[in-house]
Each structure stands twice: as structure tokens, then as C-alpha cells.
């Protein structure tokens, strides 16, 4: 479906009907596979351009997995890229991505859109920020450590509920 430009929603609906699975299971599979092909295409494109390294970018929110937090900002040789090891997706629903490292430096992303963890207000911040820098600056510094821990717990509870949701 991706190669034909088919919308994700259409692929999800077709998979739900064809395989007789719940919509949540179909959505998880389609989104995870889309992430796989997107990142593999990026790796191949980087290789064709002579780019030898890439940087791992975790999604900047409290729902990001521990493994993606740990990998965020790390730089890997392009010829060692392995899905599930150092290349997203690392797990189902993975929202992490990669970016090229050019001439020994990280290619600057112009900016990355993120949401305030309390208000949900959307804003753009510098593109080369790591997860830890984002967390310290936009969660802990802004709301305090106690509130940060409370927000983390809430995000994990939400994530667990979403993961355990039964398909109809």
C-alpha cells in the first residue's frame, strides 16, 4: 500500500476486513510497518548520497519508550543499521525516526513540533535537541520534578491502557 500511495486508513480498513482482525491490531501493524519502510528508505537514500552515519531521534513526549529515550541523539554507522537494534521501529507503535550526519556533524533540523505536556499547546523548538534536553527544559524545569514524575506516571498508565485495549 505504501508504494502505491495508499492512505494508512485505507490499508487499516482493508487489513481489518481481509484478515478478520480488530482495528487496533490492524492499525498497530500498518503503522509499525510504515515506520519500518520509511526508515529503511531513509537508510537507502543516505547510502546513495554517500552519507555514512545517521542520528536517532525519539519523539519528544512522555509516551516515548525507554529504549527510544536511550537511543535518542546517538549516532550510528549507516552500514550497521539494524531495525530493532539501532534503527526504528524498535517496537510496535514506534514513532522514532532518523536523520543524516553530514561531514561529521549532525544535519540541523530546522525545528521540531512538540506539545506542552500539560496544556497540549503545540510549538516548534530547535531541531537538534535531545530527548533528555527536552525533558529537562520543557518538563522538569517548567513544571518541577514532582509534577514531572506525576506526568510520567500518567503517560505510562495511558500507554498501558491503550496497549491492553481489546479489539472488537
What does each model-found stretch correspond to?
Residues 1-14:
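Structured, charged N-terminal subsegments at the starts of enzyme catalytic cores
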Residues 17-18, 24, 28-168:
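Activation/maturation switch segments at domain boundaries
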Amino acid at each position: 500500500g505504501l508504494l502505491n500511495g495508499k492512505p494508512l486508513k485505507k490499508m487499516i480498513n482493508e487489513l481489518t476486513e481481509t484478515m478478520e482482525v480488530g482495528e487496533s491490531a490492524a492499525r498497530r501493524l500498518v503503522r509499525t510497518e510504515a515506520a519500518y519502510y520509511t526508515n529503511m528508505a531513509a537508510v537507502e537514500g543516505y547510502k546513495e548520497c554517500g552519507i555514512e552515519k545517521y542520528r536517532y531521534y525519539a519523539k519528544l513526549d512522555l509516551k516515548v519508550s525507554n529504549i527510544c529515550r536511550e537511543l535518542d541523539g546517538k549516532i550510528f554507522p549507516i552500514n550497521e543499521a539494524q531495525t530493532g537494534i539501532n534503527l526504528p521501529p524498535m517496537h510496535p507503535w514506534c514513532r522514532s525516526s532518523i536523520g543524516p550526519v553530514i561531514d561529521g556533524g549532525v544535519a540541523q533540523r530546522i525545528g521540531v513540533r512538540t506539545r506542552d505536556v500539560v496544556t497540549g499547546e503545540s510549538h516548534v523548538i530547535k531541531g537538534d535537541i535531545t530527548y533528555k534536553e527536552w525533558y529537562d527544559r520543557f518538563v522538569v524545569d517548567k513544571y518541577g520534578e514532582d509534577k514531572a514524575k506525576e506526568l510520567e506516571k500518567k503517560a505510562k498508565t495511558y500507554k498501558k491502557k491503550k496497549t491492553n485495549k481489546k479489539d472488537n
